[in-house]
Design a protein with these regions (language model features):
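Conserved acidic residues
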Residues: 64, 132, 162
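A short helix->loop->beta-strand "cap" motif at the edges of active sites that frequently abuts
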Residues: 85-87, 159
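Short glycine-rich phosphate-binding loop at a beta-alpha junction
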Residues: 63-70
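Short, glycine/charge-rich flexible loops or terminal/linker lids adjacent to PRPP-binding catalytic cores
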Residues: 87-134
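Active-site-facing substrate-recognition patch
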Residues: 1-62
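Short Gly/Thr/Asp-enriched flexible loops that form oxyanion-binding sites at enzyme active sites
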Residues: 75-84, 151
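PRPP-dependent phosphoribosyltransferase catalytic core
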Residues: 2-10, 148-190
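Gly/Ser/Thr-rich loops at beta-strand to alpha-helix junctions
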Residues: 70-76, 142-143
């Protein structure tokens, strides 16, 4: 990963991004003594999600099915699936549900969680993935933990990872993830 770190300027409250001509002001949140992140929340932003889905769908033509994790990836994967005319997409849940039959489980520790979480898919979804080209979709990739867990689920279900896409990469660039923009991490000079 190639890191993208900007110096934090005392008193700075926002970071502005522009993706596909749409500008958004993101609040800077302190996450440690010397580190701030620009908080990105796309839930409810139909205009932004629709525009990003248009661009990301171009990268996923040729996939048979898409997978994401709950919950912020759901509106994005829904829009992309609509554009690609996919009849179904898979959502990995963040905990086992009583209705799941023979669930597949992969553990990860996203940057927004204090403890490891389990990403799970119902075993009844395996036929939708097995022997298929699967596009992995996320709104933002920070530590790559969630994306890696989704990859594991695809492989466990017998699918092939087609491509991995995200609206934003945070703090660095991963060569195997296609994206629309980068969010830097902000560090205070010591």
């Amino acid at each position: 990963m190639k890191e993208v770190i900007f110096p934090y300027q005392e008193g700075r409250e926002y970071y502005e991004i522009e993706i596909e001509g749409l500008k958004r002001r993101l609040p800077l949140l302190r996450v440690s003594e010397d580190t701030w992140i620009a908080y990105f929340d796309s839930l409810g932003d139909r205009e932004f999600i629709s525009k990003c889905a248009e661009k990301l769908s171009e990268k996923l033509r040729g996939s048979d099915i898409l997978i994401t994790s709950e919950s912020k990836g759901i509106p994005l994967v829904h829009e992309i699936a609509k554009i690609l005319d996919h009849k179904r997409y898979i959502v990995a849940r963040k905990e086992l549900k009583p209705f799941m039959v023979n669930p597949l489980v992969a553990e990860c520790r996203p940057v927004t969680s204090k403890a490891p979480i389990k990403l799970c898919i119902d075993g009844r979804y395996v036929p939708y993935i097995k022997d298929k080209s699967v596009g992995i979709v996320d709104d933002i990739v920070s530590t790559r933990e969630t994306m890696s867990a989704l990859e594991k689920l695809v492989v466990m279900a017998g699918g092939r990872v087609y491509k991995k896409v995200a609206i934003l990469l945070e703090g660095g660039v991963y060569d195997d993830v296609e994206y629309l923009g980068i969010l830097p991490i902000f560090k205070k000079a010591v």
